A protein has these predicted regions:
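Extracellular glycan-binding segments that recognize GlcNAc-based cell-wall polysaccharides
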Residues: 4-9, 36-62, 84-112, 136-161
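Short beta-strand motif characteristic of blades in beta-propeller domains
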Residues: 13-17, 61-66, 110-116, 161, ...
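Alpha-helix initiation/capping motif
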Residues: 17, 26, 56, 65, ...
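Core mixed alpha/beta domains of very large multi-subunit molecular machines
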Residues: 4-43, 67, 79, 86, ...
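Single conserved hydrophobic/aromatic residue that forms the stacking wall/gate
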Residues: 1-3, 162-171
Length: 171
């Protein structure tokens, strides 16, 4: 895919890692590809990229942790950085918790959260308050012995058909 032809100036790649780091890089930074590839994000040891989205720099971002919390902030709270930068803290995570999902909310949509024990919850985006980046967030779904940890968060519309299944087991 040739990024230079597909996206105009003013677009960004917004990335989030499991350790709560976020990064916004101008899309033009990826227009000159090399045969050995390009580094998009410098990761700490043990950290992984959980999500990336192409944005216009004026959107909102929602980050969900496996502890059941969510934080919502303006994308403009994160400055644009070069390709090799590490990024900034998007969400403060307690010891042992990880980020599981990043969403760029659309107006009128809802968030469907699912727990490890099969519980689900559908919540309007307007129910999540907007804060500055770097906080611990608010409870999206209670994470306890009954529910288990949060395992997924996706954006859905009123007419969305949802199918959830457990992973297949090898025989």
């Amino acid at each position: 895919m040739c990024i230079r032809d597909r996206y105009t100036e003013g677009h960004f790649i917004f990335m989030a890692t499991a350790n709560g780091t976020v990064k916004k890089t101008p899309l033009e930074s990826f227009s000159r590809q090399r045969s050995v590839g390009l580094i998009a994000l410098e990761l700490d040891e043990g950290d992984v990229l959980i999500s990336a989205a192409i944005t216009d720099g004026e959107r909102e971002v929602m980050l969900f942790s496996d502890g059941g919390k969510v934080t919502r902030f303006k994308e403009s709270d994160v400055r644009a950085m070069g390709r090799t930068a590490r990024g900034v803290r998007g969400m403060r995570l307690p010891e042992g918790q990880k980020l599981i999902s990043m969403l760029i909310p659309e107006e009128g949509s809802q968030i469907l959260t699912a727990s490890a024990r099969g519980y689900g919850k559908r919540t309007a985006i307007t129910e999540f308050p907007e804060y500055k980046r770097g906080g611990q967030g608010v409870i999206a779904m209670v994470s306890n012995d009954r529910n288990g940890r949060l395992v997924g968060a996706v954006q859905v519309l009123d007419l969305s058909l949802i199918h959830i299944s457990e992973p297949t087991r090898p025989y």
